[in-house]
Amino acid sequence: MLARSRLPIALLLLFSATAFKPSTPPRQRSAILISWDGALREHVNDCLKRNQMPNLAQLIREGRMVDIDVSDHVTDTRAGHAQMLTGYDPSVTGVVSNAVFRPIPLGLSIFERLQQAFGKKDIATIMVTGKAMGLGPGGPKISAATEAASPNQASDEDEKQTRRVEKMRLAGEQNVQGQPFHLTKGTLTAWDGDMPRDARGVGQKALAMIDKFGPKGRFFLFLHFGDVDVNGHKYGEGSREYNDALVTLDTWLGRMVAQLKTDGLYDHTAVYITADHGFDVGTTHHSKATHIFLASNDAQVTSAGEQRDITPTVLQAMGVDIGKITPTLPGKSLRK
């Protein structure tokens, strides 16, 4: 039987003590967007049914959880996060896959849209990640190394994963323009994504960022947790390790909400949780992993949609007139 996550009673009571207030004017709201890398929608739903994710369940009770599909790009880290954090397709961002990418053009990210709408001095934009490869800010590099062999040629799962990581690394080294967020990094108020971190590392950074920027005014914080994806590649979707990683992320969600409440921020901070891609059921890869989700304490999120809808949803919740954005966002807000 899979182990259940347990939080101190005091923490659970704190979680239920206050709630996000939809009546807060949009231009007074802050927001946190969390990516659970590789979190398959069906597996998350199974965890909820087993009562293994009490903090996510509480968030959903306050707001909503809707189905999100990836429909127009490769289901991997670079392509998924490029669309999640811009709302645009690969034809605009230039981020096609983990192997084919360029820096996202300046001005297109959700961070920059918020700055354009409200001014850099009036909203802090923050990014904390758990992967250096795929979400790192690396600049142009050229490597003479040849591409790693296809993972399908590997003899076992450990070897496949080693080759996947090597292939991704070499793609980054051979890229003559830079990583997807190479240009975006310089526009942010704070960035911490230059090294791999587990949930504890990202979670502790998240608490520190909330404590630092929350009391000063409005903020938008993006957090990337890579643990589910890492365990999925190593042990497979459906494994105890994959499941335990999800339970761990739920624990950190509870701690972040508790910090928001301690700092008096939660009633005007919308929290959104999603994924860059899911996982192919029972496998160690995500080649056709289109099933993800969007969970939030924002009860106005009512419609299922696509990954390209996440950026306009968050922007609208924070008071941005998404109809005035150029180039026109291909997605729509999922809020009523």
PLM features: residue spans?
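Feature captures the catalytic ectodomains and active-site-proximal regions of enzymes
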Residues: 21-336
